C-alpha cells in the first residue's frame, strides 16, 4: 500500500494532539484511581523453577527485537557514571554509591514499566496480526494506559521505599563508622574491610537491604504488568502479587536470586553489563506475569 509524504507541519500537529490526548487520559486515570482501589480477586497459577528458563528466553527474545540495551546505554549508564564521578570528588558520597546502585532492585519494577509495555505490545501484534512490531514508540503507550494513575501511585510507593533504604544505609554507616566521612576512597575501602565496624556495616547493611528488596519483589512481582494489562484496582494488583509469591515461594525466591545475581554480575565490569542485564530482566518480568496470572480465569 502506497504511503503519501505528509506535510511536516501537519505531522507535528498530529503528534502534539496525540501527546495531549495521552496527558488527558492520564489525568482521567488519576481521578479513576481514587475510587477504584480493590476489584474482583484474580486467580494465580503455580509455576516451577524450570519455567523461569522460558521466561528468561522470551525476555531475551524481546530484548534482541527491541535492542533496549541502547536505551539503557543512553539513559542509565550516564547517570551511573555521573554518580561515580561525583563520589570521586565528594568523598562523603562514597558510602552511598553501593546503596544507590543496589537500590535499583527496589526501583526496578517501576523503571521497567516501559519495557513491560513494549513486551505487551509485541505480544499483541504477534498474536493478532502476526506482525513483529518492535518500535521504541511502544514504550510511550504507558502514558495512555487506563491505569496510568495507579501505576504512578505504586511507583511513588517504591520511590519512598528506595529513599527509606538510603536513609537506613546512611544511618548504618554513621552507627558503625562514626559521624565523620572517609578522607578518600582508599580509606573508605580500608575501613570497610579491615575494621570490625566495617564488617558490621556489610553484614547488617546487606541484611536490611535484603528485607527491602524482598518487600519490593513480593508486592510488585506482577503488580505493574497486571495494571498495564487489565483494569484492576491498585490494592488488587498488590494483593495478587503477594498471593502469587505465597503460592510460588521457591520459584519467586529463585527469581529474586536471578535478579540479584544478574545485577551483581552486570555491575562488576564498571556497570557496563547492566545495560544488558536490566532490560532482559524487565522484559522477562512481563512473561513471568503471564505465567503467574492466567488470562481468562479469574476467581
What do the predicted segments below correspond to?
Residues 1-299:
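Hydrophobic alpha-helical membrane segments
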Amino acid at each position: 500500500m502506497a504511503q503519501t509524504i505528509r506535510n511536516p507541519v501537519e505531522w507535528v500537529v498530529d503528534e502534539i494532539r496525540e501527546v495531549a490526548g495521552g496527558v488527558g487520559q492520564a489525568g482521567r486515570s488519576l481521578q479513576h484511581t481514587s475510587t477504584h482501589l480493590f476489584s474482583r480477586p484474580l486467580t494465580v497459577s503455580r509455576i516451577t523453577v524450570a519455567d523461569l528458563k522460558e521466561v528468561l528466553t522470551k525476555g531475551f527474545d524481546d530484548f534482541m527485537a527491541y535492542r533496549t540495551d541502547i536505551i539503557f546505554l543512553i539513559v542509565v549508564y550516564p547517570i551511573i557514571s555521573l554518580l561515580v564521578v561525583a563520589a570521586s570528588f565528594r568523598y562523603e558520597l562514597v558510602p552511598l554509591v553501593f546503596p544507590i546502585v543496589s537500590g535499583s532492585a527496589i526501583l526496578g519494577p517501576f523503571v521497567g514499566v516501559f519495557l513491560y509495555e513494549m513486551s505487551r505490545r509485541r505480544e499483541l501484534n504477534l498474536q493478532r496480526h502476526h506482525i513483529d512490531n518492535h518500535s521504541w514508540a511502544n514504550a510511550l503507550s504507558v502514558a495512555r494506559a487506563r491505569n496510568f494513575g495507579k501505576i504512578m501511585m505504586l511507583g511513588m510507593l517504591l520511590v519512598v521505599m528506595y529513599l527509606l533504604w538510603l536513609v537506613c544505609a546512611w544511618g548504618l554507616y554513621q552507627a558503625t563508622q562514626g559521624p565523620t566521612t572517609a578522607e578518600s576512597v582508599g580509606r573508605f575501602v580500608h575501613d570497610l574491610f579491615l575494621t570490625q565496624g566495617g564488617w558490621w556495616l556489610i553484614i547488617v547493611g546487606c541484611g536490611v537491604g535484603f528485607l527491602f528488596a524482598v518487600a519490593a519483589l513480593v508486592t510488585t512481582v506482577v503488580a505493574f504488568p497486571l495494571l498495564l494489562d487489565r483494569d484492576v484496582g491498585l490494592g488488587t494488583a498488590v494483593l495478587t502479587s503477594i498471593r502469587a509469591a505465597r503460592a510460588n515461594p521457591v520459584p519467586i525466591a529463585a527469581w529474586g536470586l536471578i535478579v540479584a545475581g544478574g545485577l551483581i554480575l552486570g555491575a562488576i565490569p564498571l556497570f557496563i553489563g547492566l545495560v544488558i542485564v536490566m532490560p532482559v530482566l524487565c522484559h522477562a518480568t512481563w512473561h513471568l506475569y503471564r505465567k503467574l496470572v492466567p488470562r481468562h480465569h479469574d476467581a
